[in-house]
Swiss-Prot record:
One of its GO terms (cellular component) is cytoplasm. PROSITE patterns: TRP_SYNTHASE_BETA (PS00168). This is Tryptophan synthase beta chain. HAMAP family: Trp_synth_beta. One of its GO terms (molecular function) is tryptophan synthase activity. Pathway: Amino-acid biosynthesis; L-tryptophan biosynthesis; L-tryptophan from chorismate: step 5/5.
């Protein structure tokens, strides 16, 4: 693997976020990355492209998504009323999650480049589903690589992809999860990039993918900022999003980064505990290295090999993280915290029980952190407004949660009303 020489001077857009990012890929892929970057720059400068994309976001995806204030949480107690939790409802985007925002943008880019085939990787199946429906809409061939373990635990999404006409290829190598699906997708793209576009599903990978994904997801924070100002007359105190690779979080953070008074928090999967060896908290507990074409934080062992990540949530089960998140952490602009499986399961049940919303397990990590902060604010009598990215709906997780709670009855929510 080689990095493109003189990278800072030979790309149209900045390829690094501080020391993180770059293009650590086989030289044979550099022309494809150059073509993608040029197409992206041309498209974003085109009023016609922006109008077409805006039309899809409005009429097909259902944007803008609403902002919902939790009416029953945090639970009643002394000091009730100090903390307010608002949910940015990306679970209501067509396809069931935030993923469709940037997928529509990238598929339009692919058509603009004359590509006829789309390659994607998926973990929980949400990105694969979004890619499959976008390809069905726009008449492109779709191939989705998915870890064999994820295929087994996300059967409803596998069938949804197939209904949209996608070919789903289970990946047996390695741990059979998202990391291995990315590897296979990159191999495919290396061999077929003249007719194929690799539609990366997270804000990681080689430049220009982190920038492209952020810009197509930025609509989340642009809408949320305007909605918070309209509803509360001020910006939120805290913005929280779950972080695996980091796409929904960078979309949720993007328009708040320059607002120094807004605290940005990424909720990483602490799995069975940060000291258990079974987690995916890349920034909280990882090291700097190179994975999937970018320099960022990753999970690796004492020999320098990439470690297998773990999370109850397939969409957070990734041993790397987007380079802009690494930079936000390194500069202190954002804070990244670990949320355990047990905490996420409690939050999943709380939101379903008390607000009538079934969140994705991924989003439940962010909501779990919001509940913690709200509890502290209530106890201390501190006025606090928390904005949570509810990145996806939990239909895909219901069976998994049911089985897990049957096996671990101590995690079943006790009714506190």
């Amino acid at each position: 693997m080689t990095e493109k020489e003189n990278l800072g001077g030979s790309t149209l857009l900045p390829a690094y976020f501080g020391e993180f990012g770059g293009q650590f890929v086989a030289e044979s892929l550099l022309p494809a990355l150059d073509q993608l970057e040029k197409a992206f720059v041309d498209a974003t400068n085109s009023p016609e492209f922006r109008e077409e994309l805006g039309g899809y976001l409005r009429d097909y995806l259902g944007r803008p998504t609403p902002l919902t204030e939790c009416s029953n949480l945090p639970l009643s107690g002394e000091g009730k009323g100090f903390a307010r939790i608002f949910l940015k409802r990306e679970d209501l985007v067509h396809g069931g999650a935030h993923k469709t925002n940037q997928v529509i943008g990238q598929v339009l880019l692919a058509k603009r480049m004359g590509k006829t085939r789309i390659i994607a990787e998926t973990g929980a199946g949400q990105h694969g589903t979004a890619t499959a429906l976008a390809c069905a809409l726009m008449g492109l061939e779709c191939v989705v690589y998915m870890g064999a373990k994820d295929v087994a635990r996300q059967q409803p999404n596998v069938y949804r992809m197939q209904l949209h006409g996608a070919k789903v290829i289970p990946v047996e190598s390695g741990s059979g999860t998202l990391k291995d699906a990315v590897n296979e997708a990159l191999r495919d793209w290396t061999a077929t990039f003249h007719e194929s576009h690799y539609l990366l599903g997270t804000a990681a990978g080689p430049h220009p993918f982190p920038t492209i994904v952020r810009e197509f997801h930025k609509v989340i924070s642009e809408e949320a900022k305007a909605q918070m100002l309209e509803r509360t007359g001020k910006l939120p105190d805290v913005v929280v999003a779950c972080v695996g690779g980091g796409s929904n979080a960078i979309g949720m953070f993007a328009d708040f980064i320059d607002d120094e008074g807004v605290e940005l928090v990424g909720a990483e999967p602490a799995g069975e505990g940060l000291d258990s060896g079974k987690h995916g908290a890349t920034i909280t507990n990882g090291q700097i290295g190179i994975l999937h074409g970018t320099r960022s934080y990753l999970m690796r062992n004492s020999d320098g090999q990439v470690e297998e990540s773990y999370s109850i949530s397939a969409g957070l089960d990734y041993p790397g993280v987007g380079p802009q998140h690494a930079h936000l952490h390194a500069t202190g602009r954002a804070t990244y915290v670990g949320i355990t499986d047990a905490e996420a399961l409690q939050a999943f049940q709380y939101l379903a029980r008390y607000e009538g919303i079934i969140p994705a397990l991924e989003s439940s990590h962010a909501f779990a952190y919001a509940l913690k902060r709200a509890k502290t604010a209530e106890e201390e009598g501190q006025n606090l407004t928390i904005l949570v990215s509810l990145s996806g709906r939990g239909d895909k997780d219901v069976d998994h949660v049911r089985r897990t709670l049957e096996e671990n009855p101590e995690l079943i929510l006790k009714d506190n009303r």
